[in-house]
A protein has these predicted regions:
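Short, charge-dense linear interaction motifs
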Residues: 1-127, 131-133, 138-144, 148-221
Length: 221
């Protein structure tokens, strides 16, 4: 005797319970005194003659570059970040007049002696710098410090998972089934809008920066 299964009958299957998971987040942080400052500074000139605006800008920038070198900043730590030429106008009754040209040459300067940031700014301002748009403090040990913060984040997430499991009596697996590294904003930035023309070094305070890491762990139970 033989039996035949109808083509319209679905195949036999075993129903498995849905896998249960628990997601926890961990954060780690390392505070450190910065040892690098990155300064965005530049020279802006205006003139009705584009040629004269460029010439004046070039002369001032050459003085600034030589001043930076004289201050002991290596050429490899000085690079052009922007060079922009814009026509400028005044308006009256919707009409343009007084056309002129603005030339802006911006530099990114990396300083490894951050206690000299104020002196550097004061010196280059006296040589023609009239635009300082950004001062950022960081560290050249970012990779090592981030690894330390990442370890702290993993321990934080693991600790939270144990607390939840013990409180709710959940039989979670000892190892997570998924680990996700989450994005964290870069270290804090100190910004200033324009250069000062006062004859003294501005009191720049770097303080401390924080290197952060965050993770997401998923456990099954």
């Amino acid at each position: 005797m033989s039996y035949m299964q109808s083509d319209n009958q679905p195949p036999a299957s075993v129903s498995l319970p849905d896998a249960r998971t628990m997601k926890v987040y961990g954060n780690g942080k390392v505070a450190v005194k910065p040892n690098v400052a990155i300064v965005q500074l530049g020279v802006v000139t205006e003139n009705k003659s584009l040629h004269k605006a460029q010439q004046e800008n070039t002369e001032k920038m050459n003085k600034v570059l030589q001043t930076l070198v004289n201050l002991g900043i290596p050429n490899k730590n000085i690079q052009t970040s922007a060079f922009i030429i814009n026509p400028k106008y005044d308006y009256q009754n919707g009409k343009q007049f007084n056309q002129r040209y603005q030339v802006m040459h911006m530099l990114q300067v990396r300083l490894t002696h951050i206690d000299q940031v104020g002196i550097v700014i004061d010196t280059v301002v006296n040589q023609g710098v009239n635009r300082i748009t950004d001062i950022r403090f960081t560290t050249d040990q970012t990779d090592i410090l981030y690894e330390n913060a990442l370890q702290s984040a993993l321990q934080d997430a693991k600790r939270k998972s144990y607390i939840i499991a013990n409180t709710l009596k959940l039989p979670i697996s000892p190892m997570p089934i998924r680990i996700v590294e989450r994005t964290i904003n870069p270290p804090a930035i100190y910004k200033t809008a324009a250069a000062t023309t006062e004859g003294f070094a501005p009191p720049i305070q770097p303080g401390q920066i924080e290197i952060e890491a965050a993770v997401e762990l998923v456990y099954s139970y």
